[in-house]
């Protein structure tokens, strides 16, 4: 089956067809940035974009994404190696502690900023409510999203 991951055409052999998108990304396509945590779509650690929409990849059978565009955290880095404004904001605001939830948090934040270029705290909290952070860095997550919104607004 064929799909596009981070802008690159990829092929997944038929013997992977019963696996989740998350498993295929991590174990077959060697893209470990998307994290496994709860396995039931309730924590947000495994969020990727499928055709532009944020989805918990642990819930999606790989056979359901044939022919679709998948964007993972690895796909946010520019070809010149520069970080996406959200990734840089995460660093600038010292968001990560354990870092486990960060890829899913960033992918969910990207979806928010693609819909709302100037979110307030309530907008951020609402958009990010499905993403859990065991370390409780929610204030820094809010700050980083606002910082990225400013930078992304200047780039447009």
Write out the residue ranges for each language-model feature.
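Signature of N-terminal electron-transfer/Fe-S-associated modules in redox systems
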Residues: 1-156
């Amino acid at each position: 089956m064929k799909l596009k991951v981070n802008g690159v055409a990829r092929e997944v052999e038929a013997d992977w067809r019963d696996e989740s998108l998350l498993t295929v990304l991590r174990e077959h396509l060697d893209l470990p940035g998307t994290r496994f945590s709860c396995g039931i779509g309730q924590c947000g650690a495994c969020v990727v974009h499928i055709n532009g929409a944020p989805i918990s990849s642990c819930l999606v059978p790989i056979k359901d994404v044939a022919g679709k565009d998948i964007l993972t955290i690895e796909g946010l880095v520019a070809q010149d190696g520069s970080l996406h404004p959200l990734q840089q904001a995460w660093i600038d605001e010292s968001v990560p502690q354990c870092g486990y939830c960060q890829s899913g948090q960033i992918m969910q934040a990207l979806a928010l900023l693609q819909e709302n270029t100037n979110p307030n705290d309530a907008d951020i909290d609402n958009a990010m409510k499905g993403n859990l952070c065991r370390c409780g860095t929610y204030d820094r997550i809010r700050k980083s999203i606002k910082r990225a919104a400013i930078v992304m607004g200047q780039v447009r």
